[in-house]
Swiss-Prot record:
A zinc finger (B box-type) spans 5-47, 60-102. Zn(2+) 1 binds at residues 5, 8, 28, 34. Residues 115-167, 209-241 are annotated as: Disordered. This is B-box zinc finger protein 21. The keyword Zinc-finger applies. It comes from Arabidopsis thaliana.
């Protein structure tokens, strides 16, 4: 009786793998255990078929008297007919055991690990030895070599340049210069606007030394102030003449003491506030601060603002409320 391969079910099995629990022929054994390093470490036992001269059959493992006919996979024992019926008819669990007929084929006493051939011997598939020591099965037919894939070129194509300019463009058409990139992403702006520090930003420039502090413009002396007042009598403005050099942002300064009184002219008709410096000789003394409401009563016809060098915050009068509601001040 012969045992067929559990994989192809055509050829006669030559080895038994304990990890796969399957009988394999020579060709299937090479395909299964040559797949990876883990499969190559499986222990295999060669199948020893009985010879024609030796017809003695093994004895039962239970009674040790009669010839064994069956092999129980769960009990891992060979049983005779009587022992098999008494053991597997005991309950429902033993009835489900898998039993096989004995063919007289024995396993080798020693196991072997699959040893892949070297590179030199792999070139000639006809010289490969797939046999297991102690097996009488001849070498299987050689396997066909798989077709190799065509080699792929890893060359990088050089960048192409535009004939009409100096900007280099790659094969997908994207620009490589920073100026063209900024012109595409920020339309209306040029690279010179970001790089040229001499251009003023939004009409403001930095004057004087590069110390980050704006210059403070002092008023001129009394003689220069009188001379300027004589030239500007029609305008009634006491302004400070600023030098042409190192011209920066001029911030009006608040005097130490408030003027004693304000003139009758506070606001101009166009409601523009004029800034200047306070002069003791030309400006009257102010004792108390007059609110905005008194200013409106003093000059109704021709209102003009006379700058004394300080800031005056106008008071906002809330709209009149209805008669049934009380007036509430928010200030």
């Amino acid at each position: 009786m012969k045992i067929r391969c559990d994989v192809c079910d055509k050829e006669e099995a030559s080895v038994f793998c304990t990890a796969d629990e399957a009988s394999l022929c020579g060709g299937c054994d090479h395909q299964v255990h040559h797949a990876n390093k883990l499969a190559s470490k499986h222990l295999r036992f060669s199948l020893l078929y009985p010879s024609s001269s030796n017809t003695s059959s093994p004895l039962c493992d239970i009674c040790q008297d009669k010839k064994a006919l069956l092999f129980c996979q769960q009990d891992r024992a060979i049983l005779c007919k009587d022992c098999d019926s008494s053991i597997h008819a005991a309950n429902e669990h033993t009835k489900k055991h898998d039993r096989f007929l004995l063919t007289g084929v024995k396993l080798s006493a020693t196991s072997s690990v699959y040893k892949p051939t070297s590179k030199s011997s792999s070139s000639s598939s006809s010289n490969q030895d797939f046999s297991v020591p102690g097996s009488s099965i001849s070498n299987p037919p050689p396997l066909k070599k798989p077709l190799s894939a065509p080699p792929q070129s890893n060359k990088i194509q050089p960048f192409s340049k535009i004939n009409g300019g100096d900007a280099s463009v790659n094969q997908w058409g994207s620009t490589s210069t920073i100026s063209e990139y900024l012109m595409d992403t920020l339309p209306g702006w040029h690279v010179e606007d970001f790089l040229d520090s001499s251009l003023p930003t939004y009409g403001f420039s930095k004057s004087g030394d590069d110390d980050g502090v704006l210059p403070y413009m002092e008023p001129e002396d009394d003689n220069n102030t009188k001379r300027n007042n004589n030239n500007n009598n029609n305008n009634n403005n006491n302004t400070v003449s600023l030098p042409s050099k190192n011209l920066g942002i001029w911030v009006p300064q608040i005097p130490q003491t408030l003027p004693s009184s304000y003139p009758n002219q506070y606001f101009s008709q166009d409601n523009n506030i004029q800034f200047g410096m306070y002069n003791k000789e030309t400006s009257p003394e102010v004792v108390s601060f007059a609110p905005i409401q008194n200013m409106k009563q003093q000059g109704q016809n021709n209102k003009r603002w006379y700058d004394d060098g300080g800031f005056t915050v106008p008071q906002i009068t809330p709209p009149p409320l209805s008669s049934n509601k009380k007036f509430r001040s928010f200030w």
